[in-house]
């Protein structure tokens, strides 16, 4: 497979796609979840609930991996490794990012609010 350029990766990440988000479980294999993501200013944002296994895993070990798959027939894939950081809920930054993350996967503002 041909490696994408930085410009191609930036463009690829601007398209709403599903990502497989992996956290490190406490006593076994990685915990994998399909997630929505938002890419802005060289940062990937993923929304998770405080009650989720992902949150508990990340609280203990912030290491993450993501695999963002392209649609066939292009076959492109972007794989990312890094450390998660939590954002405080209820702040203007958090609310804006959460809205943009949600909105990008819906056809209209009304659908996103639904």
Question: Language-model segments: what does each one mean?
Answer:
Residues 69-70, 113:
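Short loop/turn and capping residues at structural boundaries
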Residues 4-7, 49, 53, 73, ...:
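Residues at secondary-structure transition points
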Residues 16-50, 56-58, 64-69, 77-79:
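Short beta-strand segments
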Residues 1-18, 74:
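Extreme N-terminal tail/first-helix region
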Residues 1-4, 76-114:
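Charged, gly/pro-rich active-site loop segments
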Residues 9-10, 55, 98:
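Short amphipathic alpha-helical segments and helix-helix/interface helices
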């Amino acid at each position: 497979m041909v490696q994408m350029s930085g410009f191609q990766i930036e463009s690829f990440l601007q398209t709403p796609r599903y990502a497989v988000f992996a956290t490190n479980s406490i006593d076994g294999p990685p915990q994998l979840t399909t997630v929505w993501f938002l890419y802005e200013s060289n940062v990937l944002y993923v929304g998770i609930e405080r009650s989720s296994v992902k949150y508990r895993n990340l609280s203990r070990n912030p290491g993450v991996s993501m695999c963002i798959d392209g649609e066939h027939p292009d076959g492109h894939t972007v794989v990312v490794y890094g450390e998660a950081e939590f954002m405080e809920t209820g702040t203007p930054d958090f609310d804006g990012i959460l809205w943009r993350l949600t909105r990008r996967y819906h056809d209209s503002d009304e659908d996103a609010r639904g």
